[in-house]
Every structure is written in C-alpha cells, then in structure tokens.
C-alpha cells in the first residue's frame, strides 16, 4: 500500500490543485471575454509565432501542448475554420504535416497578448515577490524536465 502524505504535503497538494484549477479557469474566462480565444487557441498561436517560419510539425506541437495527436487535430481543425492557422504538408517530409500561423492568427495573438498579460499579472505574478517567482520557476522547471523525461522514457520501447 502506498504511504499517505503527511499533513503539510497534503495541504501543499490540495492548495496546488485548487489554486491551479481556479487560475486556469480565470485565465481562460478572461481570454474568452477579451479576445474570443480559448487558452488552447492562445497557446497554439504563441508556439507557432515563436517557431521558425511560424510553423511547427503537428507531432512537435502536440508534444509542446501536451495534447494527444487526435486532440491537436481537432484543435487545429477548429482554428483553421476561423482562419487562425493553416495546415500544410511538411516541406522536408511530405508524409508529415505542419500547423502554420496565418496573418489573421498573428493579428488575433497580437490583440489578445496585452489583455492576457494583464490577466496573468493580476491573477498570479503581481501577488508574488521576487523570491517566490524564483522558487516557483525552479520548482516547475524541474518538474517539467522530470515529467518530459518520464514521458519520453515511457514512450520508448525497452531494450531487449
């Protein structure tokens, strides 16, 4: 049987779960009110805007978003209907495809970004001092590295 968490660690876990859900919901609500973009829409647009040529392979984009391939396909399809992204064959490998940021998608991102930044500041960043920002950055970067490594290890066939 798995050992239970002590009271301090249980309080940490529960505080994280509730606050992260509330934060995500608030950021999502603010984004939709200010821009008619979902959080997933916004994240796709950001990742494409930062990529060389404003395009990414679908598999890489799914990995960065922590989406299943089918979820990303659906997400990109809904964004294509709204003209925010295009889907094109990968120039280097015609079997693969890439999501590509459109001019309309870039405009939507540029219009939404200041509102989203205000929301992030209001609901998270401005409530933290410099030491707390540094601590959270260390904790979540370490956690992200470990979870990415765990995911990579679990998706790689074991050597026989």
Which residue stretches match the model-derived regions?
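A cross-family signal for key residues in well-ordered alpha-helices
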Residues: 14, 46, 110, 137
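N-terminal leader segment of winged-helix/HTH proteins
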Residues: 1-35, 130, 134, 160
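Exposed, interaction-prone assembly regions rather than primary DNA-binding/catalytic cores
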Residues: 132-160
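Charged, amphipathic alpha-helical coiled-coil/dimerization segments
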Residues: 77-135
């Amino acid at each position: 049987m798995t050992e239970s968490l002590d009271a301090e660690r249980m309080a940490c876990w529960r505080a994280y779960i509730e606050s992260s859900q509330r934060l995500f919901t608030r950021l999502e609500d603010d984004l939709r009110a200010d821009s008619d973009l979902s959080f997933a829409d916004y994240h796709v647009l950001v990742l494409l805007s930062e990529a060389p040529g404003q395009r990414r392979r679908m598999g890489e984009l799914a990995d960065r978003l922590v989406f299943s391939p089918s979820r990303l396909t659906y997400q990109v399809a809904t964004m294509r209907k709204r003209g925010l992204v295009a889907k094109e064959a990968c120039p280097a490998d015609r079997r693969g495809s890439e999501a590509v940021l459109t001019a309309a998608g870039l405009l939507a991102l540029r219009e939404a970004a200041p509102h989203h930044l205000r929301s992030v500041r209001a609901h998270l960043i401005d409530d933290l001092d410099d030491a707390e920002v540094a601590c959270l950055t260390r904790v979540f970067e370490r956690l992200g590295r470990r979870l990415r490594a765990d995911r990579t290890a679990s998706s790689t066939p074991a050597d026989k």
